[in-house]
């Protein structure tokens, strides 16, 4: 079985369990230090979206980050390779502003220049990096914006942790190998001409220990101070990227 089908089956199973239990995850459930990059991701989206925008979310999962998009009043097309995950989204959000569509991000079933904005929250590793970049650029309108939050694969501590998840059967090998790195961000810069990035969480691996010792608020401040004191890039856990199509 291909890695793509392994991941599809995994997420279909998780989505079915969520539907059966009526228990849906949200980015808002993250601890404060880990939620910081998602807050920034949402703030960048808020700067470029309005109720007339047509937004494509790739790798939407069970809608962990879709609620914020819908709250802006924009029309949202949530896509994922897992049909059961999209079923969760449809159950969670009953609005005519939402469209769901089963789609492979390597070959999006949309015409060129269809969307004002494309967003991705943690999904860029679920397709061939070059093919996904090509498809994102293709479906964006001129002056359209791509905004993403994802993990960065340059820190050896985080790379080791992802490999442990693979050994435990929680991730496929191709997914961890395609986790974005600085070289991939350079490809986005070459394609779009210019990108804006911000990096977070050089000490996120210490978060559980810090929270036990200091609590969430102080731990968040410590993490922020470390990120600001040092020019974190290679050591980052997460990044937020914004690129505009010329």
Where does each model-flagged region fall?
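A short glycine-rich, Lys/Arg-flanked "PGG" loop and its adjoining helix->strand segment in the class I
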Residues: 131-142
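A conserved beta-strand element that flanks and buttresses the S-adenosyl-L-methionine
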Residues: 119
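Conserved class I S-adenosyl-L-methionine
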Residues: 1-50, 147-170
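Short alpha-helix
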Residues: 176-193, 197
């Amino acid at each position: 079985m291909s890695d793509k089908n392994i991941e599809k089956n995994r997420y279909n199973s998780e989505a079915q369990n969520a539907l059966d239990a009526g228990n849906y995850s949200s980015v808002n459930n993250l601890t404060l230090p880990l939620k910081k990059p998602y807050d920034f991701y949402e703030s960048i989206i808020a700067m470029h979206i309005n109720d007339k925008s047509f937004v494509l979310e790739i790798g939407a999962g069970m809608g962990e980050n879709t609620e914020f998009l819908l709250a802006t009043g924009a029309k949202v097309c949530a896509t994922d390779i897992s049909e059961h995950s999209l079923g969760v989204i449809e159950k969670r959000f009953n609005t005519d502003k939402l469209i769901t569509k089963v789609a492979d991000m390597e070959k999006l079933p949309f015409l060129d220049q269809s969307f004002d904005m494309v967003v991705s929250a943690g999904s860029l590793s679920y397709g061939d990096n070059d093919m996904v970049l090509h498809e994102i650029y293709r479906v964006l309108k001129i002056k359209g914006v791509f905004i993403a939050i994802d993990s960065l694969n340059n820190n050896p501590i985080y790379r080791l942790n992802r490999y442990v998840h693979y050994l435990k059967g929680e991730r496929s090998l191709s997914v961890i190998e395609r986790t974005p790195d600085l070289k991939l961000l350079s490809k986005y810069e070459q394609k779009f001409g210019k990108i804006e990035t911000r990096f977070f969480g050089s000490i996120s691996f210490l978060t559980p220990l810090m929270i036990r010792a200091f609590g969430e608020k102080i731990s968040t401040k410590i993490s922020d101070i470390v990120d600001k004191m040092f020019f974190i890039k290679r050591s980052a856990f997460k990044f937020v990227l914004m690129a505009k199509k010329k």
